[in-house]
Amino acid sequence: MSQITLEELPGVGPATAEKLKEAGFNTIEAVAVASPSELATTAEIGESTAAKIINAARQAADIGGFETGDIVLERRKMVGKLTTGCMEFDEMMGGGIETQAITELYGEFGSGKTQLAHQFAVNVQMDREHGGLNGSVIIIDTENTFRPERIAQMVKGLSEKYGMELDPEEFLQNIHVARAYNSNHQILLVDSATDLANELREMGKPVRLLIVDSLMAHFRAEYVGRGTLADRQQKLNKHMHGLLRFGDLFNASVVVTNQVMAKPDAFFGDPTRPVGGHVVGHTATFRLYLRKSKGDKRIIRLVDSPNLPEGEAVIAVTTAGLTDQ
């Protein structure tokens, strides 16, 4: 982490620094990964000045520029893996849900997307010995699906699984939930999440998981018809990159749930497709397709990953949480 303050950056005085902080740019790292247009609008300065400030921040934070592959490999060792709680699922994911990446869960209603999100919110708070990341959780809830009672059930399930005394109240205190009422509010909440994550990091409770459940609900409701598609995708693209930036800044896993649609011209194979188009497809690091099976079983397919082969895992969603089948 950089030791210099915003005010020490060339071109940033006390007034500009205050505007940046009000907009959520509290650290050198946050400025370093911003775009010139974004910074110019926020601080009411010219784009050329904003570009100089960003370049100075990148040098101070040692962000940007070319690196050799071995250095990237060394830095990749900082990436954490959050256990899913299921051995087969973890193996398919190369050890668990990665930090500094967006993992998309898509599937039809009742396929278990929200259940997985709840389970990850519990697992991430466990110590590394038990597959967790010792972290806090931020949830952006767009469909009013967060249920604290479900968290308590899952904590009880982990208590029985590991033979430990775990307090559901403590787990709930480390989960910070905000309800998003429209797409603008949803995007704004990512900025608010950045402020909260900075505060929690200073308190020794780093955020290691950001959940958006569900990603596309408001965008689908507000942007209807082909005429609005370009505007929707542009706005969605900005939102997805804001989520990616959050994951990088805080070494956190970003998990988004997504709705599906049926592709009417698909005569062969599964017609189910995730909504959000190429914007979501290109920005999500890992794409997981959830399908219902018999009873409480769910089939999870790894559809896309930069480093892992396609594969399937079968899990069970029980009262105690996710388990191997």
Swiss-Prot record:
InterPro entries the record matches: AAA+_ATPase, DNA_recomb/repair_Rad51_C, DNA_recomb/repair_RadA, DNA_recomb/repair_RecA-like, DNA_repair_Rad51/TF_NusA_a-hlx, Hlx-hairpin-Hlx_DNA-bd_motif, P-loop_NTPase, RecA_ATP-bd
Family the entry assigns: Belongs to the eukaryotic RecA-like protein family.
PANTHER family: MEIOTIC RECOMBINATION PROTEIN DMC1_LIM15 HOMOLOG (PTHR22942:SF30), RECA/RAD51/RADA DNA STRAND-PAIRING FAMILY MEMBER (PTHR22942)
Pfam families assigned to the protein according to its UniProt record, in alphabetical order: HHH_5, Rad51
NCBIfam families for the chain: PRK04301.1, recomb_radA
Annotated GO MF terms: ATP binding; ATP hydrolysis activity; ATP-dependent DNA damage sensor activity; damaged DNA binding
Alphabetical UniProt keywords: ATP-binding, DNA damage, DNA recombination, DNA-binding, Nucleotide-binding
GO BP field: DNA recombination; DNA repair
Protein name: DNA repair and recombination protein RadA
Functional description taken from the UniProt entry: Involved in DNA repair and in homologous recombination. Binds and assemble on single-stranded DNA to form a nucleoprotein filament. Hydrolyzes ATP in a ssDNA-dependent manner and promotes DNA strand exchange between homologous DNA molecules.
Gene: radA
UniProt-annotated binding residues for ATP: G107, E108, F109, G110, S111, G112, K113, T114
